């Protein structure tokens, strides 16, 4: 149970990188706003000796234990130990694997870290990341036609983090800022191959994010047009008008996380690819 300080220990044990565990655990923990998890992440646990060290730490700071282990001996040892010290434990991939086995009629290969092998998909992600970093914030617009997705929007609409998230999914993503008074690159206006998505937010949200940004930099925002209500509203109106002119789909990111924004873009991209005539 959480302590009087409203925190609890969350142990994440993996025989690979632990990314799957972290993603699932944080998604669930976010639903409990009144308690804060203290994460203990143990990646690359592949031997009894490594697991024993993990079990010692779990015993010292009892809490919820989530794991992704494929080696049956390690799973049994972990579950037995947790049961012995009255600590809840759960395999995140176990139930999913059982479902796959029941449907496919075949057992798993049991390959640890199989999702991280250096295959074509891995190198596709690396290529996408390289492209995205080079084409961030309106840089090298001559290469925009090589993108899968181009994000546009005014300042602080999460263009860069969303671009990086998409690149991690193997989608070559560029982003271009929309600024009133500054001409849009000709290359952007003539694109036909990439999907162009316009990211938007309410003026109130943009002002809040921009003020926080300036505060973190130690700058004074009291007389800055960057956070002036009228100026920001004009920016938003300009971006909307430009997007309508070019028929770019609008995506409101006001209340969306980066992950939610990226998911919406990936759906647009998938739909577009599916409906595109074969070349």
Swiss-Prot record:
GO terms for molecular function: ADP binding; ATP binding; phosphotransferase activity, phosphate group as acceptor; protein serine/threonine kinase activity. It holds the Pfam family Kinase-PPPase. ADP binds at residues 153-160. It catalyses: N(tele)-phospho-L-histidyl/L-threonyl-[pyruvate, phosphate dikinase] + ADP = N(tele)-phospho-L-histidyl/O-phospho-L-threonyl-[pyruvate, phosphate dikinase] + AMP + H(+); N(tele)-phospho-L-histidyl/O-phospho-L-threonyl-[pyruvate, phosphate dikinase] + phosphate + H(+) = N(tele)-phospho-L-histidyl/L-threonyl-[pyruvate, phosphate dikinase] + diphosphate. Its EC number is 2.7.11.32, 2.7.4.27. Signal peptide: none annotated. Keywords: Kinase, Nucleotide-binding, Serine/threonine-protein kinase, Transferase. The keyword 4Fe-4S does not apply. InterPro entries: Kinase-pyrophosphorylase (IPR005177), PPDK_reg (IPR026565). It comes from the Bacteria. The keyword Transferase applies. PANTHER family: PYRUVATE, PHOSPHATE DIKINASE REGULATORY PROTEIN 1, CHLOROPLASTIC. Bifunctional serine/threonine kinase and phosphorylase involved in the regulation of the pyruvate, phosphate dikinase (PPDK) by catalyzing its phosphorylation/dephosphorylation. Belongs to the pyruvate, phosphate/water dikinase regulatory protein family. PDRP subfamily. This is Putative pyruvate, phosphate dikinase regulatory protein. It comes from Bradyrhizobium diazoefficiens (strain JCM 10833 / BCRC 13528 / IAM 13628 / NBRC 14792 / USDA 110).
């Amino acid at each position: 149970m959480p302590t009087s300080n409203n925190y609890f220990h969350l142990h994440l044990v993996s025989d690979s990188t632990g990314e799957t565990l972290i993603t699932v655990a944080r998604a669930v923990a976010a639903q409990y706003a009144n308690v804060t998890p203290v994460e203990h992440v143990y990646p690359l646990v592949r031997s009894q000796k490594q697991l024993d060290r993990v079990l010692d730490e779990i015993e010292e700071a009892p809490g919820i234990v989530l794991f992704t282990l494929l080696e049956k001996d390690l799973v049994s040892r972990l579950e037995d130990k947790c049961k012995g010290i009255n600590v809840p434990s759960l395999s995140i991939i176990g139930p999913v694997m059982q479902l796959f086995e029941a449907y496919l009629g075949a057992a798993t290969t049991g390959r640890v870290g199989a999702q991280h092998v250096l295959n074509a998909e891995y190198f596709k992600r690396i290529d996408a990341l390289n492209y995205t970093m080079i084409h961030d914030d309106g840089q090298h617009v001559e290469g925009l036609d090589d993108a899968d997705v181009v994000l546009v929007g005014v300042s602080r609409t999460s263009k860069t983090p969303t671009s990086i998230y998409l690149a991690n999914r193997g989608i070559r993503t560029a982003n271009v800022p929309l600024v009133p008074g500054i001409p849009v690159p000709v290359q952007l206006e003539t694109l036909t191959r990439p999907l162009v998505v316009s990211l938007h937010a309410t003026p109130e949200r943009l002002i809040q994010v921009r003020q926080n940004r300036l505060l973190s930099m130690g700058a004074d925002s009291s007389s800055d047009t960057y956070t002036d209500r009228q100026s920001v509203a004009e920016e938003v109106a300009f971006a909307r008008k430009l997007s309508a002119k070019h028929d770019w789909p609008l995506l409101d990111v006001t209340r969306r996380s980066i992950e939610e924004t990226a998911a919406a873009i990936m759906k647009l991209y998938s739909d577009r690819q599916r409906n595109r005539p074969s070349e």
